[in-house]
UniProtKB/Swiss-Prot annotation:
Name of the protein in question: Pyrroloquinoline-quinone synthase
Gene name of this polypeptide: pqqC
Lineage of the organism: Bacteria, Pseudomonadati, Pseudomonadota, Gammaproteobacteria, Lysobacterales
Reaction(s) the record says it catalyses: 6-(2-amino-2-carboxyethyl)-7,8-dioxo-1,2,3,4,7,8-hexahydroquinoline-2,4-dicarboxylate + 3 O2 = pyrroloquinoline quinone + 2 H2O2 + 2 H2O + H(+)
SUPFAM superfamilies associated with the record: Heme oxygenase-like (SSF48613)
UniProt family annotation: Belongs to the PqqC family.
Organism, as annotated: Xanthomonas campestris pv. campestris (strain B100)
Functional description taken from the UniProt entry: Ring cyclization and eight-electron oxidation of 3a-(2-amino-2-carboxyethyl)-4,5-dioxo-4,5,6,7,8,9-hexahydroquinoline-7,9-dicarboxylic-acid to PQQ.
Enzyme class: oxidoreductase
Keyword flag Oxidoreductase: yes
Enzyme Commission designation: 1.3.3.11
Amino acid sequence: MTALLSPDQLEADLRAIGARLYHDQHPFHALLHHGKLDRGQVQAWALNRFEYQRCIPLKDAAILARMEDPALRRIWRQRILDHDGNSPSDGGIARWLHLTDALGLPRELVESGRALLPGTRFAVQAYLHFVREKSLLEAIASSLTELFAPNIIGQRVAGMLQHYDFVSPEALAYFEHRLTEAPRDSDFALDYVKQHADTIEKQQLVKAALHFKCSVLWAQLDALHVAYVSPGVVWPDAFVPERDSKRAAA
């Protein structure tokens, strides 16, 4: 029979889930970080990842709307500001668009979402549905993938700057900001989960929530790998580098 875990035991279980299932283990990331992708494949990654970036503040707004405690809302709303910014030129979304601009992707193509892979769209929508329909505790627990983000960000920035001459430090500014934002956010979410997952059932639910979120991130990379690496089957309406990038048009 499953026993009630102490808060520290629960944290250990959650970290074990991330160690096994976080998307830093996905083959696509190994290719990206070790310079094994061409410019078009990196463009495809950045374009599809924007759909996830765009929906992060929508996710956080959905969670915020369910918080009855004003003190909790004041803490959580910082996440929305981090991504939306205080102006169109500020925040995580703007910084991601700076990356796609630097990679030669037309801004309209990125923002419209019309060239997304279906797997990207479905994974992101599944995440939004999850945080809207599940309990507040589960929604907060699903954000705990941020516990593992600093490691992958460090690998990504170092690897991309080393291997891709079309990437600059300025283009990767999004990740530099996340090195401080993600630990702050994950520390708070982890403390909340450890405090409120006070029954066996709740502990099982928060572990399932993190497992689900890992699958959302993994599914996005699966879609990219199938379309742009192997076997190379691209959805007919999805991004094709030779056709859709500014570089090809020039």
